[in-house]
Amino acid sequence: MKIFRLPALSDNYIFLLHDPQRNIAAVVDPAEPEPVLTCLKKLGAELVTIFNTHHHGDHVGANRALIEHFPNLTVYGGEEDRGRIPGQEVFLKEGDRVQFGDRSGEVFFVPGHTRAHIAYYFPPQGEEETGELFCGDTIFAGGCGRLFEGTPAQMVNSLSKLRALPDNTRIWCAHEYTLNNLKFALTVEPENIDLQNRFSDVKIARSEGEATVPSLLGIEKLTNPFLRWDTQAIKSAMGSQDSVQVFGRLRGKKDNF
């Protein structure tokens, strides 16, 4: 399975999965149709699947247009997003499996950013060294999504599930927010050497127009404050020992950063 990162809108990423043997493709969270159609044309591939993580317009905006071009494709989304995702036919819940070509993925129910958010995890297969996590707006490189419909307790539970995946899991998040996320993280953990080094690397990468997605879960666990709510450094910075309260305060600070 090959993965293509397609920039869209101002800071979105659409991910196109390609099975070269069958010459079929799937897209994750298509914000707009043009990047997808251009990539499909270059590959000469047929789009058979849309995997949506949640209902927001910058994640489902191209669904209708892509269905018009490929009327036999299937749209997947969360069970609790019923009626909110255009063209949705498959309604997924925690522990369900999805198939793309010869790859089988697991569905995680990860409410927080929205009440119905899901993520798709494809574990390593064969000689591949990394698993692939398509997490929408749940984890960002260096951050996490705002809590529009969910609670801090829900998000802590959701991130706990994803944090338990192997460190070599690639994090395919849907926005290029990394530099600003790490600027905020440094206000919380200014003495974190791993974070300092990552910020320097990302600053250079972005100045040269390079993407910072995907990242690796192992790096996120060392540098992303929203995966470190239960470390003493973050607890001390937030003035609490209660994980949910710590996370809520952390998210509140980021909302106003």
From Swiss-Prot:
Its EC number is 3.1.2.6. This is Hydroxyacylglutathione hydrolase. Its cofactor is Zn(2+). Monomer. Pfam families: HAGH_C (PF16123), Lactamase_B (PF00753). SMART domains: Lactamase_B (SM00849). Binds 2 Zn(2+) ions per subunit. HAMAP family: Glyoxalase_2. Signal peptide: none annotated. Thiolesterase that catalyzes the hydrolysis of S-D-lactoyl-glutathione to form glutathione and D-lactic acid. It comes from Gloeothece citriformis (strain PCC 7424). Zn(2+) 1 binds at H54, H56, H113, D137. Keywords: Hydrolase, Metal-binding, Zinc. The lineage of its organism: Bacteria, Bacillati, Cyanobacteriota, Cyanophyceae, Oscillatoriophycideae.
